[in-house]
Amino acid sequence: MKLLQAVHLTAGWDEKYPARDMGNGKIRSVGMAMAMQGSGITCVDVGSATLKLNDEGIYTLSISSADMGTGCDTILAQIAAEVLMCPLENISVIAADTDATPYDSGSYASSTTYVTVEKTALGLITKIKAFGANMLKCSIDDVDFDGKSVINMHTNESVSLNDIAVSSMCGATQSLQHTESNSMPSSPPPFMAGMVEIELDKE
């Protein structure tokens, strides 16, 4: 409704509708159209991502969305880096290889970005905190993660991300990686409106 009101005011609709007689056999009139495009369609569109902590303390982000000019490889890496509190160069992206990367229903419009990678990064942080807490011999509730270390908030003892990475890979315990998928419970409705003014020769 706000979009239609904005078009209505910008176009001077009230002064031009339904038509103005130009006095030379011609009239001027206006028309308006509105459309909606499906994006993040419920029960159809799904995005998935996997983040893995490697033994050198950097991350691999695996996605199946193809960068067709949207910049999604960079954008999704930036989102992961922001959540994980690390430099962008610490995120290595493997993209659009559906034999190796988690399922994604496609890259189009701007619906590729945001939700899944954030969820994946937050899930990986939880696993990093749990692993770090185990190394510090305390509860996960006692620790925090600052992007470089897991810190016991009560004793200020810490274990570095690099040590966690090496221990998880080489200590016969577990590889630290996390996968998430996201699909919208309802479709967000991207919409657009436009107005045209025409001059018509009635004859």
Positions of PLM-derived features:
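Short conserved active-site loop signatures built around small residues
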Residues: 91
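Cofactor-centric catalytic regions
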Residues: 1-84, 96-203
